[in-house]
């Protein structure tokens, strides 16, 4: 089994082109995602992305290492199954939204908000990062810039961030 060019990494064509001749066979991929034992204070609930969409013929198998939290892992495992079933047409955002909806149909909008803000493992020894809080990143950047450069608050950005915080709680 091969985890990629690091213990926690995405898998793409160039890494498989490198390792397959060394193995003298197609790699069996053990993807260390959404496992979070290296960042136990984080949940990895965001979209599954970063792996090549053109690698199905360059590997012998693909398995995902889930988090120690079985129920929380279901969002990512749903998307990993979607990805491995049809790589060429895989869309991470669509798959993620379907996973959230199918796993919690009565309250999908709340789970989506929670998951959108719980997707990055944070700084870690594996240097593996994920996007988090994507929808409010421009507002957060504007707030930070205004404060750092002018010691002021960008009121529009503040309102956007405050609204997202209200959704969270």
Residue spans for each PLM region:
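Catalytic-core regions of glycoside hydrolase
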Residues: 1-88
């Amino acid at each position: 089994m091969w985890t990629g060019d690091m213990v926690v990494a995405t898998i793409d064509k160039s890494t498989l082109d490198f390792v397959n001749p060394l193995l003298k066979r197609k790699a069996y991929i053990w993807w260390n995602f959404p496992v979070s034992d290296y960042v136990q204070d984080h949940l990895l609930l965001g979209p599954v992305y970063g792996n090549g969409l053109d690698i199905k013929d360059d590997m012998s198998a693909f398995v995902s290492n889930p988090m120690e939290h079985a129920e929380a892992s279901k969002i990512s495992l749903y998307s990993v199954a979607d990805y491995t079933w049809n790589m060429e047409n895989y869309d991470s955002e669509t798959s993620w939204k379907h996973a959230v909806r199918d796993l919690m149909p009565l309250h999908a909008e709340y789970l989506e908000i929670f998951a959108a803000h719980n997707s990055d493992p944070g700084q870690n020894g594996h240097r593996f990062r994920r996007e988090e809080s994507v929808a409010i990143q421009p507002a957060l950047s504007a707030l930070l810039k205004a404060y750092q450069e002018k010691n002021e608050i960008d009121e529009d950005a503040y309102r956007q961030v405050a609204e997202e915080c209200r959704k969270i709680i």
